[in-house]
């Protein structure tokens, strides 16, 4: 199995830690005035989603995780599994709710998502960075109400709740950033 040294650590690198695939979120190289240099690393375990901090001595090595990232189109949810399809081979994969996690509210049919596979099984689903969803429920925007420019909450067609500007009405389609759950703009 391939190994990677601590001086090659960077955000997004997938490594094995305690026989479990993990992704490096942040890597900080620390060189104290006295003693050996080390790397302080924030890691997210891909199976559980748990984030932890670990310290590696300078020169340590870690095994590269044997995970594959593939782009698949989201098809549907049958209540137990979320189904995805490869557009070139038409092969279908089913991911359980644990693999999808909080990202279920951003899954829109026929949108391309990135699935992380480990031993052929999906362990993580990443939706596209931006999705277009219809506003199904929100308070009406009253003309002249400019006090408190924080906006108002709006429920979208997938059940996600996002803060939107006062002018957004029910039935409009808006663009949302899935990484921060923020309103980006209206879709024309």
From Swiss-Prot:
Transmembrane segments: none annotated. One of its GO terms (molecular function) is translation elongation factor activity. Pathway: Protein biosynthesis; polypeptide chain elongation. NCBIfam families: efp, PRK00529.1. SMART domains: EFP, Elong-fact-P_C. Involved in peptide bond synthesis. Alleviates ribosome stalling that occurs when 3 or more consecutive Pro residues or the sequence PPG is present in a protein, possibly by augmenting the peptidyl transferase activity of the ribosome. Modification of Lys-34 is required for alleviation. Gene3D superfamilies: 2.30.30.30, Nucleic acid-binding proteins (2.40.50.140). This is Elongation factor P. Pfam families: EFP, EFP_N, Elong-fact-P_C. The modification N6-(3,6-diaminohexanoyl)-5-hydroxylysine is found at residue 34. Belongs to the elongation factor P family. GO terms for cellular component: cytoplasm. May be beta-lysylated on the epsilon-amino group of Lys-34 by the combined action of EpmA and EpmB, and then hydroxylated on the C5 position of the same residue by EpmC (if this protein is present). Lysylation is critical for the stimulatory effect of EF-P on peptide-bond formation. The lysylation moiety may extend toward the peptidyltransferase center and stabilize the terminal 3-CCA end of the tRNA. Hydroxylation of the C5 position on Lys-34 may allow additional potential stabilizing hydrogen-bond interactions with the P-tRNA. Keywords: Cytoplasm, Elongation factor, Hydroxylation, Protein biosynthesis. One of its GO terms (biological process) is peptide biosynthetic process. The keyword Cytoplasm applies. It is found in: Cytoplasm. The gene is efp.
């Amino acid at each position: 199995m391939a190994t990677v040294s601590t001086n090659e650590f960077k955000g997004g690198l997938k490594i094995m830690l305690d026989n479990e695939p993990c992704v490096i979120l942040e890597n900080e190289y620390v060189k104290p005035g006295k003693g050996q240099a080390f790397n302080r690393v924030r890691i997210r375990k891909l199976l559980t989603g748990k984030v932890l901090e670990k310290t590696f001595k300078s020169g340590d090595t870690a095994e590269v995780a044997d995970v594959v990232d593939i782009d698949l189109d989201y098809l549907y949810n049958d209540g137990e599994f979320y189904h995805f399809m490869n557009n070139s081979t038409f092969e279908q994969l089913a991911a359980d709710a644990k693999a999808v996690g909080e990202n279920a509210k951003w899954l829109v049919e026929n949108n391309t998502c990135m699935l992380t596979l480990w031993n052929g099984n999906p362990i993580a689903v990443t939706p596209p960075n931006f999705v277009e969803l219809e506003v199904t429920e929100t308070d009406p925007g009253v003309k002249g109400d400019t006090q408190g420019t924080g906006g108002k909450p709006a429920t979208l067609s997938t059940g996600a709740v996002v803060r939107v500007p006062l002018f957004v009405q029910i039935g409009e389609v808006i663009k949302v950033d899935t990484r921060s759950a923020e309103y980006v703009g209206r879709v024309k």
